[in-house]
UniProtKB/Swiss-Prot annotation:
One of its GO terms (cellular component) is cytosolic large ribosomal subunit. Part of the 50S ribosomal subunit. Belongs to the universal ribosomal protein uL22 family. InterPro entries: Ribosomal_uL22, Ribosomal_uL22_bac/chlpt-type, Ribosomal_uL22_bac/org-type, Ribosomal_uL22_CS, Ribosomal_uL22_sf. This protein binds specifically to 23S rRNA; its binding is stimulated by other ribosomal proteins, e.g. L4, L17, and L20. It is important during the early stages of 50S assembly. It makes multiple contacts with different domains of the 23S rRNA in the assembled 50S subunit and ribosome. The globular domain of the protein is located near the polypeptide exit tunnel on the outside of the subunit, while an extended beta-hairpin is found that lines the wall of the exit tunnel in the center of the 70S ribosome. Keywords: Ribonucleoprotein, Ribosomal protein, RNA-binding, rRNA-binding. PROSITE patterns: RIBOSOMAL_L22 (PS00464). GO terms for molecular function: rRNA binding; structural constituent of ribosome. One of its GO terms (biological process) is translation. It holds the Pfam family Ribosomal_L22. This is Large ribosomal subunit protein uL22. It comes from the Bacteria.
């Protein structure tokens, strides 16, 4: 059985989070957590929590063996954008877009 975990509204841009997600896509759950644990990127900490939550969901809800789990899919979608203004020279202003992400992780048995 597949188990899912979703983090909505993570305050990181999807472009930055997708770089980390691509590193662990398709790996076993244990090796993915180890890679994310030693990564220095902010997205790695967020994705590690979601992967660990999906592993816990698989164990508690479906009784899956943790050692046999693999990351089937990991998707990073765009979330809500916060629009802010920054003061510039000569009375002007420019727009700042603070992006957020929705991170979805699906783990299942390795085939």
């Amino acid at each position: 059985m597949e188990a899912t975990a979703i983090l909505r509204g993570a305050r990181i841009s999807p472009q930055k989070a997708r770089l980390v997600a691509a590193q662990v896509r398709g790996l076993s759950a244990e090796s993915a957590v180890n890679i994310l644990r030693f990564s220095s990127k902010k997205a790695a900490c967020l994705i590690k929590k979601v992967v660990e939550s999906a592993i816990a969901n698989a164990e508690n809800n479906h009784g899956s063996n943790i050692d046999a789990l693999k990351i089937n899919t990991i998707i990073v979608d765009e979330g809500r954008m916060l629009k802010r203004f920054m003061a510039r020279a000569k009375g002007r202003s420019s727009r700042i877009v603070k992006r957020s992400s929705h991170i979805t992780v699906v783990v299942g048995p390795a085939k």
